[in-house]
């Protein structure tokens, strides 16, 4: 009997030891109200909103790299444009009847005003500081040559005068005037070449990486906010109460895993968002695929170049190129100094992130999105040809493209820089099989417990309105509450209204945000006279336009 008792006791001890070992090996669990995946501007913006709207919510941000804003949000990995359609010709397409559509331009400009208000509120609240470290006044210009393009720009300028958001824009076809605006663009140019330009003084250059750093630094001051760097998401599990258990690995601690249990999860991981969304298993993810495109820029830091160019000058996309691929020569403020960038030139890699894996594209291809990808490739062969031609460009080809915008450029003043990756959205379509979608898209489950941001353009410049839209989608009841409504109108004074068409409101908003963000702004005295719009633009032929992509 004693032997039997001893044996049973030994078995119990052994089983308990095994159980204790299993418990020790099981991933530890931490709890949080909100889990932000990705340390870029989108997660930082959403976290900043929620910290003010619902300060009792705990938040955790995880980032795979060893610091925030090291991918697409980094200033060197994007164009740094405060996209407001002041110069981007792709936002004002020509209709079949020859007229100019300004609807998208108005939408983009309205969205950027929301971002300006959001950043202004953060400066006034002490969340952000030293506006010149992240936003600076840089005039925005459109520049074209040739009769057809000049006529288009003239008609575009006239059409934009219908909107209060574009007051103060100037138009010129005079070589001397344009040379005064952008000397490098005009010096050495054929004096008989027909050219035209528009210029808006209130354009901006924005360092989205610096904005991200400042927002996250402020969030870290809160006891219930936790930042976990070098932390990779490994899996998702939906719980019975609709919360999520997300397994993550500590890449600096032998990839030790632990579980984060969150009531709401935001996937703001840039190019990696699609793959992570697929891993959640929500049916909404089945509608999407992604196609990665990279971008390169020529960079000059030579003071003789940099000090003689103070503008962002956008051109017209060449025939057969996507509208978004417009070349531009830009003043940038990076690492505390002025530089000039020209590009972009498209590149191809199967990586979804600059620091991603060559297996990203293949591993994101599923039985549900394979055919939509094939359909997009078949339907957009011009786009495929364009990307192939870009990949084949030589250094001489890129320099020749630069000389179209800077005729007296010298090769020794420029170096090539590889910027970030942009994953284009491909969405399943019942009629066409699959369509290429420009822009960003919020994808969430029907319960509103998890959401991801897919897409690339206009991206960071509209982070504030995009995250506002996300909250309206997943926190619908909260957003409708009097408490959140009051706070949202404090953060975004124009919330719930449109500035377009209201001159007084537009000027009030621009004056306020310019003062807080230390930007230049002079109220237009009178609406600029539209130039003679003859000859009229000819109706567009029934040709299929090249699909657009973000670079």
From Swiss-Prot:
UniProt gene name: mqo
Its cofactor is:
FAD
One of this protein's GO BP terms? tricarboxylic acid cycle
Identification of the protein by name: Probable malate:quinone oxidoreductase
The EC number(s) attached to this protein equal 1.1.5.4
This protein's pathway: Carbohydrate metabolism; tricarboxylic acid cycle; oxaloacetate from (S)-malate (quinone route): step 1/1
Which family is annotated?
Belongs to the MQO family.
Coiled-coil annotated residue ranges, if any: none
Q: Name one GO molecular function term.
A: 2-hydroxyglutarate dehydrogenase activity
Task: Report keywords, A-Z.
Answer: FAD, Flavoprotein, Oxidoreductase, Tricarboxylic acid cycle
Composition bias (Low complexity) maps to 525-544
